[in-house]
């Protein structure tokens, strides 16, 4: 599992840097479910297509292909297990054009390792029906939170392979924030811009540490059951978040977030209430990282999937997070904003300027979600 955690973690941080190129934008995605979805496609890739995918997904570090798929099998079983105090639903499915004759061995492996089905649709003559079918399936899997994954016109009669990956998470904090302490405060988007935000407050004992080399505080907020943690990296006000992102490698992430190396201390925590819903068309991102052949008919080699000449037509990723006093959840709620002028006190961990956050599965060290809050 460790080699896989390293591969997924490396891919996660590479994605964070690529998706976050424009540092004024919020970022939120699930690297684990993205790795998972792409690993499923990788099972059917051969030759140079497979080599590029392994490179981008950092699988070249982790031994043979078989080990990877078995690793994902255990990871998914562990993360999606029932009886947890959080709700996590990953929805992975590969939709293929039905005239392409997909190999039954490939379909069986999707089911065995990735709890995922390969479904055949008629993109050639029923493109709109196919699009709606995919959207309905995603909406069901994400409790209605992600309703319109594929926008009109995003698939066409030439579409052969659509990889769909959506994820839904809801978890309550181990220690909730008191709603009565939430008040309007200003969030410093940049040196010369501030925006109002609903700032939550809690004084309690948390694990935290300070990384001197990047002038950044790290705070761990556990979810109920302590199987998942939110890890927040907050640079000092004089330090740009870009500096932290530049320095961040998977090795450093592991070193900096080791719970046994942190102090447990009383902290005054101020954290904005926020909701992010981000959608990414992953083709340009993956091409930037070096995975090009998979998208080009004639170059793509998916002979482990089908004898037909195939290429990936679409990779869409959408995820949704809401952080509020109870915890993190994917349910829409509107709050009336109250304008209150309050004397500003100086808390010890005050996330009133851009920060990175990660939701991590403690047992497997898997980074389930990765985000950057830059602006309300």
From Swiss-Prot:
Keyword Phosphoprotein: yes
Entry's Gene Ontology molecular function annotations: serine-type endopeptidase inhibitor activity
Subunit structure: Forms a complex with the monomeric form of beta-tryptase.
Residues annotated as site: Reactive bond: 341-342
The name this protein goes by in its record: Serpin B6
Function: Inhibitor of cathepsin G, kallikrein-8 and thrombin. May play an important role in the inner ear in the protection against leakage of lysosomal content during stress. May be involved in the regulation of serine proteinases present in the brain or extravasated from the blood.
Modification type Phosphoserine: residues: 151
Residues recorded with modification N6-acetyllysine: 195
Species this chain originates from: Pongo abelii
The organism's taxonomic lineage, starting at the top: Eukaryota, Metazoa, Chordata, Craniata, Vertebrata
Transmembrane segments: none
Classification via InterPro entries: Serpin_CS (IPR023795), Serpin_dom (IPR023796), Serpin_fam (IPR000215), Serpin_sf (IPR036186), Serpin_sf_1 (IPR042178), Serpin_sf_2 (IPR042185)
N-acetylmethionine: modified positions: 1
Compartments in which it is found: Cytoplasm
């Amino acid at each position: 599992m460790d080699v896989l955690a390293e591969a997924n973690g490396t891919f996660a941080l590479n994605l964070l840097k690529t998706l976050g190129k424009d540092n004024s934008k919020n970022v939120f995605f699930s690297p684990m479910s993205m790795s998972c979805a792409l690993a499923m496609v990788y099972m059917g890739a051969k030759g140079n297509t497979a080599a590029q995918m392994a490179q981008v997904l950092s699988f070249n570090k982790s031994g043979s292909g078989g080990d990877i798929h078995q690793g994902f099998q255990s990871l998914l079983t562990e993360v999606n297990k029932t009886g947890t105090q959080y709700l996590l639903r990953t929805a992975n499915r590969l939709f293929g054009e039905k005239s392409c004759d997909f190999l039954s061995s490939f379909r069986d492996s999707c089911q065995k390792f990735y709890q995922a089905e390969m479904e055949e649709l008629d993109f050639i003559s029923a493109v709109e029906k196919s699009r709606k079918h995919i959207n309905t399936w995603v909406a069901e899997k994400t409790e209605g939170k992600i309703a319109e994954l594929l926008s009109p016109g995003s698939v066409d009669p030439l579409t052969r392979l659509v990889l769909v990956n959506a994820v839904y998470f809801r978890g309550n904090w181990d220690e909730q924030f008191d709603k009565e302490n939430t008040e309007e405060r200003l969030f410093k988007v940049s040196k010369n811009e501030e925006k109002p935000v609903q700032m939550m407050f809690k004084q309690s004992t948390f694990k935290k540490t300070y990384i001197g080399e990047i002038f950044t505080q790290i705070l761990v907020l556990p979810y109920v059951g302590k199987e998942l943690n939110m890890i927040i990296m907050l640079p000092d006000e004089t330090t740009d978040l870009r500096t932290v992102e530049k320095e961040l490698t998977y090795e450093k992430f592991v070193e900096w977030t080791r719970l046994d190396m942190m102090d447990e201390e009383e902290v005054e925590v101020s954290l904005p209430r926020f909701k992010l819903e981000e959608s990414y068309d992953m083709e340009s991102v993956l091409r930037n990282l070096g995975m090009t052949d998979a998208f080009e008919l004639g170059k793509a080699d998916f002979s482990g999937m089908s004898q037909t000449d195939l290429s990936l037509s679409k990779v869409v990723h959408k995820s949704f997070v809401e952080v509020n006093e109870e915890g993190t959840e994917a349910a829409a709620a509107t709050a009336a904003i109250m304008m209150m002028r309050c004397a500003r006190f100086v808390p010890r961990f005050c996330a009133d300027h851009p920060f990175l956050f990660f939701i991590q599965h403690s047992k497997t060290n898997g980074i389930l979600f990765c985000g950057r809050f830059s602006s309300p």
